[in-house]
Amino acid sequence: MRTRRAPRRRSSIAVQRARGGAPAAARLRAWALAAARPGCEVTLRVVGAAEARKLNRAFRGRDYATNVLSFSYSPAQGDIVLCHPVIAREARAQGKSLAAHYAHLVVHGMLHLRGRDHRRAADARRMEREEIRLLRRLGVGDPYAIE
């Protein structure tokens, strides 16, 4: 007698793009799904610098716009906020394509929702290895490689 596996629960990724210039919603969703926990419900929001700064100040006590913020509400639910102006500026400064930098930060944010962090050096190395592995699957190069 063969045993049946439980069907894999589908993840739900909603995308809200309040800023032009960001990658298409389908691409953002695909990058998030690559790092998603089965059955998760996540909203990706692309915002401007003023909103990112306000959220960073309110939730992290840091008075500047940052590239990505992750908000986990439960093991299966969360929001990721991506600041387009900061991401675009960083991509230019690092000589990366905008799409590659967005892919990295979406995967990075999704890993935070899964409980990963980079406060300690060992945790940061583990998280970076996981990001590199997931991005490689997506056809995106190592975001930490120095060229």
Residue ranges of predicted features:
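An acidic/histidine-cluster motif and surrounding catalytic segment
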Residues: M1-A103, L111-E147
